[in-house]
Amino acid sequence: MSGHSKWSQIKHKKALTDKKKGQIFSKLGRLITLAAKKGTDPRSNPSLSQAIDNARAVNMPNENIERAIKKVSDKSQVQLEELSIEALGPGGIALKVRAITDNRNRTMAEIKKILTENNSKLVQPGSLTWMFNQPLTLGDSSIQEQLDKLFEALDDQDEVEDVSSNLAN
């Protein structure tokens, strides 16, 4: 019966759930900090109020919420910025990636690497806007698999907040 302790089983499951919680809390913390730039009072700042409500919905500790708001007033803290990135995905699919980061160059390099590994490429901002008015449908299952892999890789990236495409639902 060696190696079958109950704690070792729980430990592995707990590590996975803690990692997922940490990623969610990080994303929500960045959203709160970004929203708090417009004002640190949730009563007068609806976007901050919404971000706090979202954080509370997933049981984010109040200490983390307060720390995220405090980052805005503390000038020694690193400032966050929002990036809007456009890319051309597999099969000519238009992608918009929204990210919140404290280091623009690092985030752009990481997203560019993910796109390159998944048969996609960055394009100039605004050059694909027209494509979102013309939804595409996929007939090739291999392209759908590539897109699923790309969306999963982008979703695993901590700074990425939202990914949208011109695929018809």
Task: State where each predicted segment sits.
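N-terminal cationic and glycine-rich segments that engage phosphates or anionic surfaces
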Residues: 1-136, 168
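Positively charged, low-complexity, intrinsically disordered RNA-binding extensions
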Residues: 122-169
